[in-house]
Amino acid sequence: MYEIKRGGHADMKRIYPMLEHDFHEWERPSLADCHLGLIRGAELLLLKDESGLEAGYAYMLRDAARRYALLGWLAVYPTIRGAGTGAQFLELIKARYARYECVFIEVTEYPELEKARRLAGFYKRHGWCETGIPYAIGGRETLLLHRGEAPQRADLRGVLEAVYAPMYGPKF
């Protein structure tokens, strides 16, 4: 059985090398941007088993005022992949954000890569749906999925900008 613990800045520094391993440079934020996001309301979620051993991480961007979130980066550690741990983590995240209007997930390089197609199928089996709106990250085609009440197409850009704002908003 797993549970989610909220991580802090020391945890972010510790897991960032894993983030570098799990995600391409063009699709992951810098360590400084991750820390800035934590200061401004993003959440680092750590998946822990009953003995306290860490099994994975997720970095969530949020617009808490409007109740939107983005599951930006999620990974289960390689030594325990393939045993349903990712599905359990996703279910815990769904429960944690159940009161949010909508939670988004981006699947990069979709439908180009087989890995991206499998990942999209995994998220769809857990209740996420395609927005049907063309979307790109770093010039690469990206599938935008949602769970909950998705905003109208005309409002989507503003919603996503607000969700990303804690990490990429104005820096003073």
Enumerate the predicted regions with their spans.
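Conserved active-site alpha-helix within GNAT-family acetyltransferase domains
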Residues: 109-132
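Conserved GNAT acetyl-CoA-binding A-motif
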Residues: 97-114
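C-terminal "cap" of GNAT-fold acetyltransferases
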Residues: 116, 136-172
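Active-site rim helix/loop that mediates acceptor-substrate recognition in acyltransferases
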Residues: 20-50
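Conserved beta-strand in the GNAT
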Residues: 46, 53-62, 68-75
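Short strand-connecting beta-turns/loops that link adjacent beta-strands
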Residues: 9-10, 50-53, 63-66, 138
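Conserved acetyl-CoA-binding loop-helix of GNAT-fold acetyltransferases
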Residues: 76, 82-95
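Short amphipathic alpha-helix that is part of the acyltransferase structural core
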Residues: 1-29, 155-166
